[in-house]
Amino acid sequence: DDFEIPMQIARQGQRVLLDGRSLVFDELQNDMSGERKRKLRTLGGNFQSFARHPWLFSPRGNPIWLQFLSHKVFRLAVPYAMVCALISSLLSSTGWVQCLAAAQVAFYTAAWMGMRSPTWRKSRLIAFATVFVELNWTAMQAGLQFASGRLDLQWEKT
């Protein structure tokens, strides 16, 4: 609803505003499994809206088309871009690109270490890498599961 209703309002040519006095509550997840479930559900809802409303992708049909693409769609391409960046930099013979490949491998190694051990996650850098990789991995899973019809969109409190 927090996406569907504003998009219908925008489609009618009206402005969508958030009242600065609004109160928004979102409980922090204590564990990654709860966050993963929440992320799968919310991204699944995005994919469901995209499938229901093809006009969202039309520059003529969507008055906020550029904002929609940049805030909703391009973010979903990030996990795939990460995979492409890693593979292409690993295959490159250019020196500076190989340095970027080494940095990417170090980043993913840090994330892997954080996934394996709570002790490692005490480091802010490793914690950041871990959460960044896990959330992007979850975004990729959401897209693949939705495309294959295996994504459970049933709401449950996480």
Model-predicted segments: where are they?
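Membrane-embedded multi-pass helical conduit in multi-pass membrane proteins
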Residues: 75-151
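Membrane-proximal intrinsically disordered regions of secretory-pathway and membrane-system proteins
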Residues: 11-13, 154-158
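Catalytic donor/gating beta->alpha subdomain of glycosyltransferases that bind UDP-sugars
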Residues: 1-68, 137, 141-145
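Alpha-helical membrane-interface segments at transmembrane helix boundaries
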Residues: 70-74
